[in-house]
Amino acid sequence: MNKILFYISMERERHIEDLKKIASLSKNKKNVKTQKQRNLLGKNVITAIKGIGCRPEKVFYKPTTNFSVNGSLSNKKGLRKIGKGQMGEVFLGCVDKECKKPVAIKVSNDSNKYEYKIGKRIEKLSGTRMYAYQECDKYSIIYTEYANSGTLSSFIKNNISTLRPIHLRTIVTHVLFNLYRIHKKYPSFRHHDLHTENVLISTNVKSTGIRRFKIDDIVLKVHDIGIEASLNDFGFSSINGIPNPEIDSGDYKRKHGIYRESHYMYDVHYFLNSLRHFLKGEKILSGQETIQFIERVLPHDYLGMVTYKVSDFRLRTTPVGHEKLQTFNRIFKDRYFSPYREKTQELSKVLDIIGRAAPMKPKPIIVKHGGNPAPPKVSVSKKGYVKIGTRKCDSYKKDELVKIANILNVPTKNKTISKICQDLKLKYIK
């Protein structure tokens, strides 16, 4: 017992020290995006591709360098290939010349509308933002949010010299909590392919001090260090109400355990098991706490590439089930998350450096007392026709125009649309 308390204390102290070292960096990061800006980008994309969604190379600007996306200036239209998977190729394009609004573009030979629909359904629970879908003659395209730090694998490799246990703890906490939230709302959801290449990392997000994660009776106060992990690539995913031909065929059930009734902890197991394999294989020294955590919460029979419970790192289909697997509640009670349970005076000082989230400002309460709506504006265009608001008067349907005329106290009995418009002109245009 004393040994466990020692480890808890040691890991918590290391977490606070790491937090001190990165606190100022988190607060002073440049080019960060707020949630409002990220949502607005989706509207920009939809506007940009309107009518020409099958030709993204004609719409977006091509980043000029492989070393920096944000801030690169380009006058050349086109895309840059950034990845390739089993379901298609992924390209990068920019809405603007400065590439402050990058977009990921996935092109597949087959229709993947089911993938877009599944991703769209869970995006608010921290799936990748799905902007638009376009069905073309011989291929289909999904426009999604671009994660500036790439996949979890590339993020770890590219930051190996500065990576600390706090970074991995933050990412693991985000992924597990997001899966928990998704399962609470959509119990039938399975990602089925959640390895380190299908978790995307964004480091250009705004830090908000502390984020409160509630898992049943557990409350974690997670320190926001400006890193966000999201789920990506829903080609093998399933959720009630959306057919997926890739898994509904049954081709992946026996070998990979992929089918609609797979174990509800399938994604948690595959993510943790594949992450452990990656950290050990790449010899990531800062990953030791995470490796030890995974080996505590996953039974020995569920670790590695092949056991009688696991095939290719995935849960096997078995008639006896997987009763040894822990629930979300039990996993989040592990000491790995202890830095998020207690608030010390020292930790409070560090959070002051990061900056606490501003309290939510309540929206003004508008009390409706009835009465007539504000009268619309009547004007005459340069071409001489009558306008009501922003529309031509004669473009309104008869019943719509009668309601407007009644508000403006213009008689309408036995009058045509043309006559009502003329009367409005006579009354309001001097």
Where are these regions (language model features)?
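Helical subdomain adjoining the active site within ATP-dependent kinase catalytic cores
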Residues: K255-P364
